[in-house]
């Protein structure tokens, strides 16, 4: 099937599921500890070569923590030689001035650093790692020193949303060019911890108001910092155009070579191919996994006849699966969906107090307690 299928313009290389942090909102699979057979340097080179030949122009290095890979500089250099625009999506852990210098020499175009909170104690508690805030702060200084645009990402949830003003002040202190204030998206570990992470509607309204006030102040000062506020699906009435449509632009390769239309799709009961076994071209154009939700033939009648289907492409398939057990169902976020009550229930649950200590942290010991059939941890463990 090639007719009407666009080019895979954006390649996400999930280099590893390994990570020194333990964020309870990580979007990696719950059972990530089972997937250890990472692609080699040469195998990634081959993936980049094929993707570029197919028309891919942007390449994101993600994880886990991509800096865990000691061949990252080699991968960046190869991608740069091919003509990719390259973006490193990192926690900053494992970054040093020497590595930034080497990445700059290799041709890396862009670095995005994530924080957990503006307060060092809360930041390190959410990260499950001592001195994480200190490391991130110092790396932001070095990113500026090496003339990279300062792009910061904060995942916003009920445990840090009330400090949104302090978060923005920290970003201004670090001379950020772009700040993404992204309300938690509930996939992977975040979905497991949803009740303890989803902000209340009152919290959300206040945070958006404060963000808009800062935008006005910055505009009046002709300040270059751009604030991006990403509202969670759970407080919308229409679904997002997830990944700009299934298999339309985005091509994700997981650490073990599994090819996915989006990084969350691994959980779906669909057979996805592996780049070790099939060419990227065959995967993109011919595989069942990438063609499964293309077009509108798969849509239930209410979605297929909806005038918004060409805008939202039916919403998020992973969200439909997580909330209803069937990836073909109408996205529950949609107010027209017969499953919208699941979203309303989640909103109601957000009003229940939940402490930071109740969150299940993302680490190998917790991951090993999960299976594909039963995603329930036996006990929560925070690694020292």
UniProtKB/Swiss-Prot annotation:
Cofactor comment: Binds 1 [4Fe-4S] cluster. The cluster is coordinated with 3 cysteines and an exchangeable S-adenosyl-L-methionine.
Instruction: Check the record and name the Pfam families matching this protein.
Output: Fer4_12 (PF13353), Radical_SAM (PF04055), SPASM (PF13186)
Quote one Gene Ontology molecular function term.
iron ion binding
Where in the chain are disulfide-linked cysteines found? none
Asked if the keyword 4Fe-4S belongs to this entry, the reply reads yes
Q: Which UniProt keywords apply?
A: 4Fe-4S, Iron, Iron-sulfur, Metal-binding, Oxidoreductase, PQQ biosynthesis, S-adenosyl-L-methionine
In this chain, [4Fe-4S] cluster is annotated as bound at 19, 23, 26
Q: Where is the Radical SAM core domain?
A: 5-220
Essential cofactor(s): [4Fe-4S] cluster
The entry describes its oligomerization and partners as: Interacts with PqqD. The interaction is necessary for activity of PqqE.
Report the protein name in the record: PqqA peptide cyclase
- Which species expresses this protein natively? Acinetobacter baumannii (strain AYE)
């Amino acid at each position: 099937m090639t007719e009407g299928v666009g080019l895979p313009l954006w390649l996400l290389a999930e280099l590893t599921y390994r990570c020194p942090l333990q964020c309870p909102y990580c979007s990696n699979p719950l059972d990530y500890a089972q997937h250890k057979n990472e692609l080699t340097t040469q195998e990634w080179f081959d993936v980049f070569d094929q993707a570029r030949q197919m028309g891919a122009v942007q390449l994101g290095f993600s994880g886990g923590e991509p800096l865990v890979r000691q061949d990252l500089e080699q991968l960046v250099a190869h991608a740069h030689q091919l003509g990719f625009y390259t973006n490193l999506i990192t926690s900053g852990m494992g970054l040093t001035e020497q590595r930034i210098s080497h990445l700059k020499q290799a041709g890396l175009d862009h670095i995005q650093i994530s924080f957990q909170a503006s307060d060092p104690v809360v930041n390190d508690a959410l990260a499950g790692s001592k001195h994480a805030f200190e490391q991130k702060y110092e790396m932001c200084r070095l990113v500026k020193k090496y003339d990279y645009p300062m792009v910061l990402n904060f995942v916003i949830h009920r445990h840090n949303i009330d400090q949104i003003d302090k978060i923005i002040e920290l970003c201004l202190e670090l001379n950020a060019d772009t700040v993404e204030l992204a309300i938690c998206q509930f996939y992977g570990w975040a979905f497991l911890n949803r009740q303890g992470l989803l902000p209340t509607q009152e919290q959300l309204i206040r945070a958006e108001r404060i963000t808009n006030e800062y935008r006005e102040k910055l505009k009046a000062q002709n300040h270059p910092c751009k604030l991006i506020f990403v509202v969670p699906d759970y407080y919308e009435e229409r679904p997002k155009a997830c990944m700009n449509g299934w298999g339309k632009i985005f091509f994700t390769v997981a650490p073990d070579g599994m090819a996915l239309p989006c990084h969350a799709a691994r959980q779906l009961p669909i057979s996805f191919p592996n780049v070790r076994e099939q060419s990227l071209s065959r995967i993109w154009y011919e595989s069942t996994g990438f063609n499964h939700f293309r077009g509108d033939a798969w849509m239930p009648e209410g979605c297929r006849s909806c005038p918004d289907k060409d805008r939202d492409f039916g919403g998020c398939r992973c969200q439909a699966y997580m909330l209803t057990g069937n990836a073909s169902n109408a996205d529950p976020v949609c107010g027209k969906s017969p499953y919208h009550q699941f979203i309303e229930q989640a909103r109601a649950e957000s009003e229940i107090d939940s402490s930071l200590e109740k969150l299940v942290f993302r680490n190998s010991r917790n991951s090993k307690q999960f299976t594909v059939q039963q995603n329930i941890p036996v006990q929560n463990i925070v690694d020292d």
